Amino acid sequence: MRNPILRRAAARTAFLLLFAAGVGGLGAQPVLDIEEELDFDHPEAWAMKFFTSASLLTSLGPVERREAGAVDLGLELITIPHLDREQRTVGFGGFKEEELNRLPVWARLRVAFGLPRGFTAVVGWVPPAELDGVKANLFSAAIEKAILQGDRWGLGVRLYAQVGDAEADFTCAAGEERSPPGSPENPFGCEAPSDDEVTLEYVGLEWTGSYRFRRPRAPVLHLGVAVNHLDMEFQVNARTFGFLDRTRLLADGETVSATAGATWSLGQKTKAGFEVFYSPLSVERPGAESSDNDPLLHLRALLRYRLR
């Protein structure tokens, strides 16, 4: 049975029959604990791809040769596009609208370290501060090297990865439990705000080219292309219709992405960069005969300060 909705319904029915027959003897709450390997274009997989792609540790500027021991501190801002109702309807195979529009902007701390032989290590961190019911703890890192750096043209290569997760009441948003289970306002029987966890992990390889104008105060332009492997998991933790839903959804696959932007020097030690990010993301929604492209297109910014 490939349909996740039918599988969960069958599992709930089995639990009900066992519970009614007295297997739930001590009155413990039945637990729905199944694991679903999703196709990469499944609606729920698309939602995970969307937010994982938003967290990719892109160059956000040209790949530069730093002296060994140099340290740059940075603050990155990542805009998150607003999702319409169709895009938010990803739960239960694309039939349940989820509360995905939480934060319009993410912030990430970045530190770049100059290493011997022209390498640079970049570390990024989204600290676990709870904002609008979302608490993310994402650790990312990259190793990069400028393989060509002339007076005007440059080319660099980067290898990056991320581990971490985000927690929020995605499945049962706060307030849904106030309506009777099964009612139009609470059709999926939420009894309390859920405590879901989504794992956003990846590894990627990026090539970044750059161009420097001869004019003073002119920006440095950059263009990047990357291939990414996304490894994602959504752990449901919701009480619905008398059950504790602990369904685990897994998805992994490859994406490509492109970036274009510019970086300005604001002084001897400070730089500001902006970037447009694009990644095509396939999705097959209920009723569709084939996959469509519902891409991620958004803006990023980075303010850097040379500490030493």
Segments the model singles out, each with a brief description of its role:
Residues 30, 67-73, 117-119, 151-157, ...:
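Outer-envelope beta-barrel architecture signal
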Residues 73-79, 121-127, 157-165, 221-229, ...:
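Transmembrane beta-barrel strands of outer-membrane/channel proteins
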Residues 294-308:
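Outer-membrane beta-barrel "beta-signal"
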